[in-house]
Amino acid sequence: MARLLLALLAWLAQMSPVRAAGSVRLAGGLTLGGLFPVHARGAAGRACGQLKKEQGVHRLEAMLYALDRVNADPELLPGVRLGARLLDTCSRDTYALEQALSFVQALIRGRGDGDEAAVRCPGGVPPLRAAPPERVVAVVGASASSVSIMVANVLRLFAIPQISYASTAPELSDSTRYDFFSRVVPPDSYQAQAMVDIVRALGWNYVSTLASEGNYGESGVEAFVQISREAGGVCIAQSIKIPREPKPGEFNKVIKRLMETPNARGIIIFANEDDIRRVLEATRQANLTGHFLWVGSDSWGSKTSPVLSLEDVAVGAITILPKRASIDGFDQYFMTRSLENNRRNIWFAEFWEENFNCKLTSSGGQSDEATRKCTGEERIGQDSAYEQEGKVQFVIDAVYAIAHALHSMHQALCPGYTGLCPAMEPTDGRTLLQYIRAVRFNGSAGTPVMFNENGDAPGRYDIFQYQATNGSASSGGYQVVGQWAEALRLDVEALQWSGDPHEVPPSQCSLPCGPGERKKMVKGVPCCWHCEACDGYRFQVDEFTCEACPRDMRPTPNHTGCRPTPVVRLTWSSPWAAPPLLLAVLGIMATTTVVGTFVRHNNTPIVRASGRELSYVLLTGIFLIYAVTFLMVAEPGAAVCATRRLFLGLGTTLSYSALLTKTNRIYRIFEQGKRSVTPPPFISPTSQLVITFSLTSLQVVGVIAWLGAQPPHSVIDYEEQRTVDPEQARGVLKCDMSDLSLIGCLGYSLLLMVTCTVYAIKARGVPETFNEAKPIGFTMYTTCIVWLAFVPIFFGTAQSAEKIYIQTTTLTVSLSLSASVSLGMLYVPKTYVILFHPEQNVQKRKRSLKTTSTVAAPPKGADTEDPK
């Protein structure tokens, strides 16, 4: 296979002598090859296009300048002169390959095995012998990575070392495929790392990439994507490739695609300067000036040509360029070049015409008045603008790297020998490669020049930003804002942006979540998320997690943490406590007045007729009902909670037991009187008291058993007022009584109340002589209404934020109202008569015979029901 390839290359070398003639030749003992993009890529089938003044001519002249200096240095390669064969690649890899075949012609002919003897001319004339081609020992170039790759595949077959001054594709670091390739510029893998560091330093996490088709653009983007994936925190929205031969409207489509992900404002661009310029033009046409945030590779660097007349679109662009310096010696050399002293450069005349916008010779036809004739006296830098091209330093360093390697090789193989010794004729490429990889010297800019095992130079970059000057983009320029050498040093404060000059614009898939929000990641896109509020009682633990606060805590207003839930209770000063306390105080005062009046007039007919014993029991129950209000408002504690359990139902039980006993006695007397004159049993005062206290004892025994089974204590209930809005949440300090326990505590007395009401209904037909039957009935009816109203109010506020206040107030007011009804209907009228109408407090005449005969006489010693 190798023999077949060599035969093919030999044939191509023989077929391309004409094209190879367009070159710069310098005679020398050792010849270096050079590849430079003197012309741009041609259009419409042409191999070469317009002259490239800076990238082509400047770089080619830099090699000539370096060779002059090496040959003039008596300490470097003494007695050995370096020659050169410099070729134009026309910025096209296939054309460069054809040109590079001239570098291997001598080697191919050396392997020709007597092919020349087989050449016969017509008539037996011997063939003309052409001058033998130079034996190229090393090659400087090429510029574009695609060209270097194409040429490297050929040079390695003939063991010719190659050093590039501008090719940065990571692919060229593969020493198994490009083992004879080296470069004095760092590979794009370093550049890609620097660009990833820049993106991260700016806080961007969502960017798109844009690459020119070819090794440089595609390899650079691939390296950026891989490094960003390994580093994490940066996602690629889109990776767009610009075709090698873009069609009309292609760049408008590129901008349209970039706008499909408008949040990815950061655009990582690995493209040639022509593509960069057309991307900027399409951006302006789409009226998107200021939207995209460009991060350009070294192909953009600090060049003015891509941004000329497009400065407003380029403002804010961050670009990267291998660390370099302007070489003053080259400036002096180049600005003194003229048509007279630079005849060795066959393209210099074309450069002269292009640079000074003139013509050296007039055409045979009608002359163009707009183009003047060159005088030859023009001066570079005086009659035309001049700025040293950015890769000049690296061209000089590449030449010196080969020179230093040859010098070391000469010292090792030809010690004490001036000129070339037989050991270096011919020069072995593999041995030279070893010396090239071992060189270490200070280059033209004073920075160290060296190579690693893959032939790569260390990564050292300057970081630029294109900034407006005094608010004018057209007068702006590139400013150094940082450096990168294994680590990024970026002066963020020196950056300027459109809009707010000092605020870094975002390039993020999703905006940062606010306080109290967590990131809900989008599946498959680690840099995109939705912000989800930590609502309710949840708080933000970290950027991805919400958790519920402990039960005794509630979230802070911004849901970034938890804080203790306030504890509340019904206090003496609370507005909710005022109405029940007022009713209780008035009720106690009224009850005390009634009791005092009854005691003072204990033997008067009205007091005796009301049933003194049960009246005092009933009044005691009413007093206890009013007193419960103070227990319900008091601060909960073990003693208060125990007292609440005991007295909450005791007062009502005592009252309703007494009323039930009374109504039952009246009903039994009335029913018994219908059948006989014999009085019913258990209607004496003692019997009535025994029945009342027996009924009450059931409540007391039940409460005592409850106290023993579940000792009372206070609790803080955080669920009672755990409202939807955490800001309204409260912990309620209360006794350990649930709503059902409270109803259970009152349930027995309510049962007595219902039973009493039933007897009151049954006794509604009792004759007027039993003057308490109807008041008791009205009392029970009203009490039932009060408690029926209590139930929906009490349980209907279970979810209210004011539950503790409403329920306590409702309960105490209901108790006080029921007590007031009993007091008002049964005893206030009697007290009024006793105090204000004593003349009515006398025993009336005996009942009529008819009435008396139908009602059993009370037992001896009992209080009687006197007629009105």
From Swiss-Prot:
Gene name, Swiss-Prot/TrEMBL: GRM6
Major localization class: membrane
InterPro entries: ANF_lig-bd_rcpt, GPCR_3, GPCR_3_9-Cys_dom, GPCR_3_9-Cys_sf, GPCR_3__mGluR6, GPCR_3_C, GPCR_3_CS, GPCR_3_mtglu_rcpt
Subcellular location: Cell membrane; Endoplasmic reticulum membrane; Golgi apparatus membrane; Cell projection, Dendrite
Reported function: G-protein coupled receptor for glutamate. Ligand binding causes a conformation change that triggers signaling via guanine nucleotide-binding proteins (G proteins) and modulates the activity of down-stream effectors, such as adenylate cyclase. Signaling inhibits adenylate cyclase activity. Signaling stimulates TRPM1 channel activity and Ca(2+) uptake. Required for normal vision.
Signal peptide: 1-20
Membrane topology classification: Multi-pass membrane protein
Name this polypeptide is given: Metabotropic glutamate receptor 6
Residues glycosylated per entry: 287, 442, 470, 558
Subunit composition and interactions: Homodimer. Interacts with GPR179. Interacts with photoreceptor synaptic protein LRIT1 (via its N-terminal extracellular domain).
Membrane-spanning intervals of the chain: 577-599, 614-634, 646-664, 689-709, 740-761, 775-797, 811-836
Pfam families: 7tm_3, ANF_receptor, NCD3G
GO cellular component, one term: Golgi membrane
Disulfide bridge positions per record: 48-90, 235-527, 358-374, 414-421, 509-528, 513-531, 534-546, 549-562
UniProt entry tagged with the keyword 4Fe-4S: no
Keywords of this entry: Cell membrane, Cell projection, Disulfide bond, Endoplasmic reticulum, G-protein coupled receptor, Glycoprotein, Golgi apparatus, Membrane, Receptor, Sensory transduction, Signal, Transducer, Transmembrane, Transmembrane helix, Vision
Endoplasmic reticulum found in the keyword field: yes
Family: Belongs to the G-protein coupled receptor 3 family.
One BP annotation, GO: G protein-coupled glutamate receptor signaling pathway
Superkingdom assignment: Eukaryota
Residue ranges annotated as Cytoplasmic topological domain: 600-613, 665-688, 762-774, 837-868
Residues on Extracellular side: 21-576, 635-645, 710-739, 798-810
PROSITE patterns, sorted: G_PROTEIN_RECEP_F3_1, G_PROTEIN_RECEP_F3_2, G_PROTEIN_RECEP_F3_3, G_PROTEIN_RECEP_F3_4
